[in-house]
Amino acid sequence: MKEMEVRAFKDDIKKYKGKSVAVFVYEGDLKPLARLSKGTSNKAKRVAELENFKGKEGEILKVPTLGTSVDFVYIVGLGKKEKVGEDTYRRASANLVKRMRRDKVESTVVVIPRRGDVSKEITKAITEGAILGNYRFDKYKSKKEDEKFEIKEVLINRGDEEGIRLGKIFAEAQNYARNLVNEPGNVINPITLAEEAKKLAEEFGLECKVYDEKQIQEMGMMALYSVGKGSATPPRFIHLIYKPSGKPKEKIALVGKGLTFDSGGLNIKPGDYMRTMKMDKSGACAVLGIMRAIAQLKPDVEVHGLIGAAENMPDGNAYRPDDVIKAKNGKYIEIDNTDAEGRVTLADVLSYASELKPDKIIDMATLTGACMVALGEYTAGLFTNAPDFAEEIKKTAKRTGERVWELPMDDERLRKKIKNTVADVLNTGGRYGGAITAAMFLEEFVGEGIKWVHLDIAGPAWSKEEYGYYTKGGTGFGVRTCLEYIMKVSSNV
């Protein structure tokens, strides 16, 4: 399958001769149509008025314009002008590409409402939207839908070349993560995930260290080992490293939860809750996607990608409720429930990350159903020990369209819930405030003086529906926000 091309069209749009043009318009404003040739513009405007097209976000009208320089015009609504941001363009571009696929249209050129050159940021957003919107996971379909049809190109009128380059890298990294999330547990397990990391490192010039179950025990990572020891496929610890050529402006550690499948262990999940648990590796897949892009972007930031990969299965050798396990940083964990395994694996990975003495740690984990209860399926919970760092991540997430919402960690009454134990810390905190007590558990394993943000991506890591630039399945949530933030640190913006 040939990949869809996204590139700039630098000429006056009136000179374009092709199948279609896509004009993005604000709600109630069809003036951008006047940028087309007079005949095309008049036909498109007349039909839009007859069809009562408003230009609301998500609206797309296809107008036949045979006899002019193009066969038809897509009029794509952006919504109210004052509410339009980068993510509006990203969503509009994705919706356009999905409509093109439905109509079997191979190419188009995008025209935005503003005159003149398109900014790097908006070009990047349109590029990302097109590539993300064109994503499909049909690897396991013996007969593919639209097997003989592929969109060939999306052109951006007066688009910025650097914006296109960045948009491609960001979106392809997210799609790479989506592919990994969507792979089932019989394909991606701890060993094959580690092999994928090594393959990625070799292809993109990263350093990669993989530790097997024996080495994991020797390193004192008994929490990670314990979660994975009930599976026929033993755990792996993965460490990917990117170092810039000069002195790094910062050192950032990215930590991803890598449960390649979560049955719940001895506290086994009911069947309905076990379905889709291949997505419990979403944090790890996001880290791999980010590292893929970092190797191409080459920021002046040292970046470490850290993944604890395990499969949580019931077995005669599986860890049990009441077990007490010593984590890498020397703290003892009492197991209350084996289905609260993600935080147990992350205890060791965060401890290892802290030993690297980074300036900042960002962890991403499909950690708690409680976070979904609190925030819904589309928003990640954000938890932190550093308010200034959290604000930067929140600002970045607003630009990328990856919704996050900060939840509090200052109630010591909740913290006591994970201290009611024979050990240093308990792996559950009771029914209420579960996302917060899980984050408080993780904080126990973050080193002194290190700024840390935890993203509970249990909701937005997986989509049950198609919307915007997402299809059903893995979303690759967190990839673009982390990349955007790292590039911001690199450029000192």
UniProtKB/Swiss-Prot annotation:
It comes from the Bacteria. InterPro entries: Leucine_aapep/pepB (IPR011356), Macro_dom-like (IPR043472), Peptidase_M17_C (IPR000819), Peptidase_M17_leu_NH2_pept (IPR023042), Peptidase_M17_N (IPR008283). The keyword tRNA processing does not apply. Its cofactor is Mn(2+). Keywords: Aminopeptidase, Cytoplasm, Hydrolase, Manganese, Metal-binding, Protease. The active site is at residues 269, 343. GO terms for biological process: proteolysis. GO terms for molecular function: manganese ion binding; metalloaminopeptidase activity; peptidase activity. The keyword Manganese applies. It is an enzyme of class 3 (hydrolase). Presumably involved in the processing and regular turnover of intracellular proteins. Catalyzes the removal of unsubstituted N-terminal amino acids from various peptides. Belongs to the peptidase M17 family. This is Probable cytosol aminopeptidase. It comes from Aquifex aeolicus (strain VF5). The lineage of its organism: Bacteria, Pseudomonadati, Aquificota, Aquificia, Aquificales.
